[in-house]
Amino acid sequence: MSNTTVEQFAAELKRPVEDLLKQLKEAGVSKNSGSDSLTLDDKQLLNAYLTKKNGSNSSTISIRRTKTEVSTVDGVKVETRKRGRTVKIPSAEELAAQVKAAQTQAAPVRPEQTAEDAAKARAEAAARAEARAKAEAEAAKLKAAKAGNKAKPAAQKPTEAKAETAPVAAETKPAEESKAEKAQADKMPSEKPAEPKEKAAKPKHERNGKGKDAKKPAKPAAPAVPQPVVSAEEQAQRDEEARRAAALRAHQEALLKEKQERQARREAMKQQAEQQAKAAQEAKTGRQRPAKPAEKPQAAAPAVENKPVNPAKAKKEDRRNRDDEGQGRNAKGKGGKGGRDRNNARNGDDERVRGGKKGKKLKLEPNQHAFQAPTEPVVHEVLVPETITVADLAHKMAVKGVEVVKALMKMGMMVTINQSIDQDTALIVVEELGHIGKPAAADDPEAFLDEGAEAVEAEALPRPPVVTVMGHVDHGKTSLLDYIRRTKVVQGEAGGITQHIGAYHVETPRGVITFLDTPGHEAFTAMRARGAKATDIVILVVAADDGVMPQTIEAIAHAKAAGVPMVVAVNKIDKEAANPERIRQELTAHEVVPDEWGGDVQFIDVSAKKGLNIDALLEAVLLEAEVLELTAPVDAPAKGIIVEARLDKGRGAVATLLVQSGTLKKGDMLLAGTAFGKIRAMVDENGKSITEAGPSIPVEILGLSDVPNAGEDAMVLADEKKAREIALFRQGKYRDVRLAKQQAAKLENMFNNMGETQAQSLSVIIKADVQGSYEALAGSLKKLSTDEVKVNVLHSGVGGITESDVNLAIASGAFIIGFNVRADASSRKLAENENVEIRYYNIIYDAINDVKAAMSGMLSPEEKEQVTGTVEIRQVISVSKVGNIAGCMVTDGVVKRDSHVRLIRNNVVIHTGELASLKRYKDDVKEVRMGFECGLMLKGYNEIMEGDQLECFDIVEVARSL
């Protein structure tokens, strides 16, 4: 006979391929799949294995059972069985017989095998005859017992449930076995009544196959078929194993319950009141769950039956101490349903676990308790930055984002998971969820800058003082510096006024002094504030012939706000109108008291033009510096402040940096606000290239990624990555702040303009050479706005006028102001083609005056009355269908046909209107001059009397100005 495959052989035997492969493997035949070929020798080995395995006891014969009675137990879930049907399962002996028959048909058998098979067949025939008689007697007894159980009262319902769970399995048992099993079931816990009987009823092939064939639909009851019956000796052995298994389960359950109670008490001592209640409820649930397996009629334990008694005892201690991985192996092992159900009872598993391959997929929880023990809540310390998204806040608190959204909804805020919330709201949410919130910029990379600075410690050495020269416009600040520097800076300033912050360092016999020259014009308030911030000493210049002016008072306020000492230089004492004493009195009124009057401020009378007392002024400055004991580390990364910044067409972003500490070197990575970059070049105030600059030295630097804002702090970092990270973070933060301000301004303007007429708007685009200039110009122009005409600065920036500026002006109807900058050729051509006006200025006065004139032209003209003449009514003539006609004499001026008139009676205005007609004799005339008579009628008014006067006037429109 040719070889057959495992799958074909399984079909002949009517067995699953998986079971046949397993049996072949146990018999020593290695087959991996159903397509593997199966030889005659393989079949003989399988036959010998099955014969040896199932025929180990001479008196043991597996039986085939037919179900003739069906249990109808209320509340018992039966998932794999059909009611009222016969379940026919082939036994291992039948499988062996089928294998033998197939082998007999395929090839001649050996003599010794034939003799053995013949003896086996005779024994089976005798056993079948005996089994038939016993089965019939057992069926009759079972029917009688069931009829008696139905007659019992309802009070014995639990006992009935135990008795009715067994008939399916008890059909094929002897009477003695049934009584012994019932007595044993009464001793077991109530949740395991059906297991021992089902264990005794299940044949070995069902245990080996894990109950797969039990799921097949049962056939209708057939005529009595001879069935093999187990011997009394094997039955007694099975009873003993079942009793031991029941005792083992009862002991395990008692240990489990005791362990659970012990664990629950230990957890309850650690938790608060609300966790204690929860733990008690969960522990109660865990103690009740072992009763659930009573609903599982399939929960027999053939695993115990299939093994000797001693190995079961040995596993008792092993199961008690096994870990989670061991439980999983036991659930998937050969033990079948019994092992799984015990594990399910231990873990409080309410779901039914099916046998076979499904049992291998059983996934046990790592914790063998019925509930997850509650843990003590963890309180986090959450650092909340200025703004934070809901998702980030939830991540910091280790909670789900939906919890934060719920908390915000309770507060009346409808937010999404990616929406940003402010710091105050976030702190409230953190406290609401039981954590500790602290306001801090935890995610701010700038928080690490201070740590890095503290790590670098260098010796602090004396440094030159930084002196800021402040005062009113045209009081001689720049001229004073010119004399000190021996230069003519003032001649280079447009209009003779300073419009930038100039930074210079001067070497004197007593040391180096760094000077900052600030603008005195009122438009440059921000520049003066920056100058005071970066300075050590302030020289307040006051003209002796002019006195204290508004910007002088402002400079005093800046110096006091910055907390820096002042030295007053009373300039222009060489003029005839100079009055230094008056200056001292006026400054004393502003709490600037001279030292000779008992104050703490030095007053020096100087003349910048003639150089009088300049050395005394420098001595006073150095004296103040000695008192301050100014020091700074030299061998350290540089830190400083951006004094001024601009965009140069050929060199890019150019910034004037005042080094405050450390040494700035060419090639350093510098971070200044939102700009960063490697310093490509350093230039001093004289235009000379240098490679390094120490404390208190001003330098111009090139190489930044963008034009930084004036007044920003600058510092040298170790690597570009950190500088880029901080710069990008600042850009995002500034963008959020700017958008928030714009939104607030839009809302504010919307409410302010509600109900008002639309005002005229003058749109302007400002481009300047440095940031301070366009800040000053934009601020000054905005101050010109009135309720009727407003200045709208669409864009302001540093650098020349580009095509994008012209395109913006085209779209918005604006004009462009270039302050010390020019437009390139392409921009000029585009502006000419599109009729865009570009105005160039180098003096801030001129720009402000021109814009003021343009705004004045946009104002609606003012209407004024101009009296042209006076008329006296001397006669009133009434004409029918026409009205009253006044005969008048022009007493003053002239009366015109289109004039407005005002009727006056007894010096009281009675009527104001227009003339309907003006005649002299019978002719219509345009005007009548003084001394002539005329006749006239008023339009729509006839109540005139003799003696009334008419005042003639014209309405004239007069242009307004700001």
From Swiss-Prot:
Stretches the record annotates as G1: 471-478
Keywords tagged on the record: Cytoplasm, GTP-binding, Initiation factor, Nucleotide-binding, Protein biosynthesis
Q: Name one GO molecular function term.
A: GTP binding
Q: Where in the cell is it found?
A: Cytoplasm
Q: Which domain of life is it from?
A: Bacteria
GO CC field? cytoplasm; cytosol
Q: Which GO terms describe its biological process?
A: translational initiation
Coiled-coil residue spans: none
Q: Which InterPro entries match?
A: DNA-bd_dom_put_sf, EF-G-like_DII, IF2_II, IF2_N, P-loop_NTPase, Small_GTP-bd, T_Tr_GTP-bd_dom, TF_IF2_bacterial-like
According to the UniProt entry, which residue ranges have a biased composition of type Basic and acidic residues? 117-141, 173-216, 235-269, 314-327, 338-354
Residues covered by the tr-type G domain: 462-631
Name the residue ranges with Low complexity bias: 145-155, 219-234, 270-283
Map out region (G4) in residue numbers. Answer: 571-574
Region (G3) residue spans: 517-520
Task: Please list where the region (G2) is annotated.
Answer: 496-500
Cite the residue spans of the region called G5: 607-609
Q: Which residues bind GTP?
A: 471-478, 517-521, 571-574
SUPFAM superfamilies given in the database record: Initiation factor IF2/eIF5b, domain 3 (SSF52156), P-loop containing nucleoside triphosphate hydrolases (SSF52540), Putative DNA-binding domain (SSF46955), Translation proteins (SSF50447)
Q: Where is this region: Disordered?
A: 99-366
Tell me, what does this protein do in biology?
Answer: One of the essential components for the initiation of protein synthesis. Protects formylmethionyl-tRNA from spontaneous hydrolysis and promotes its binding to the 30S ribosomal subunits. Also involved in the hydrolysis of GTP during the formation of the 70S ribosomal complex.
Family in the record = Belongs to the TRAFAC class translation factor GTPase superfamily. Classic translation factor GTPase family. IF-2 subfamily.
UniProt-recorded name of the protein: Translation initiation factor IF-2
- Organism per entry: Neisseria meningitidis serogroup B (strain ATCC BAA-335 / MC58)
